[in-house]
Amino acid sequence: MSAIERITKAAHLIDMNDIIREGNPTLRAIAEKVTFPLSDQEIILGEKMMQFLKHSQDPVMAEKMGLRGGVGLAAPQLDISKRIIAVLVPNIVEEGETPQEAYDLEAIMYNPKIVSHSVQDAALGEGEXCLSVDRNVPGYVVRHARVTVDYFDKDGEKHRIKLKGYNSIVVQHEIDHINGIMFYDRINEKDPFAVKDGLLILE
């Protein structure tokens, strides 16, 4: 049974056992574009990926299922070499406040593509991690500070979104996955915390 057949079974909930780890060649492959109309499997896969992210951010479900928290997941991380990503960034507000919207960014993207980006680069001050990497890799992961992304939804409708800050970093991380790139490829090997002129450090 293929990974997509197993994962899209009605009763299946994606867990850490479904996520492949660094060293698996699927993580280094250029994933295939999906064609429209999507297959039922491809639609269900996107929904299951989003369900996993919601479970991973729910303390009760995460503990019950042994999940690491995640804000993004790409199909290649499930050993499925397709250009499908899911992103789920919670709205962070001051303690005691309730956000109007639970999520700052919530999307299942088919064939996402960066169509333009800022000259300025940015990196998360605390570095990045990945559900497919079980070790800590310190260093600044240098990315574009702002990006414009085109993608299709499950109905084949095209969307264009402009992203900055943390949302921009998350989507770039996931698009890297469908292009066979790992986050640590973008860390300066000789000086992991090198700061070149104009680099925006996001805290």
UniProtKB/Swiss-Prot annotation:
One of its GO terms (molecular function) is metal ion binding. Fe cation binds at residues 130, 173, 177. It comes from the Bacteria. It is an enzyme of class 3 (hydrolase). Its cofactor is Fe(2+). One of its GO terms (biological process) is translation. It catalyses: N-terminal N-formyl-L-methionyl-[peptide] + H2O = N-terminal L-methionyl-[peptide] + formate. Gene3D superfamilies: Peptide deformylase. InterPro entries: Peptide_deformylase, Peptide_deformylase_sf. Its EC number is 3.5.1.88. The active site is at 174. Coiled coil: none annotated. The keyword ATP-binding does not apply. CDD domains: Pep_deformylase. Binds 1 Fe(2+) ion. NCBIfam families: pept_deformyl. PANTHER family: PEPTIDE DEFORMYLASE, PEPTIDE DEFORMYLASE 2. Belongs to the polypeptide deformylase family. Removes the formyl group from the N-terminal Met of newly synthesized proteins. Requires at least a dipeptide for an efficient rate of reaction. N-terminal L-methionine is a prerequisite for activity but the enzyme has broad specificity at other positions. This is Peptide deformylase. The gene is def.
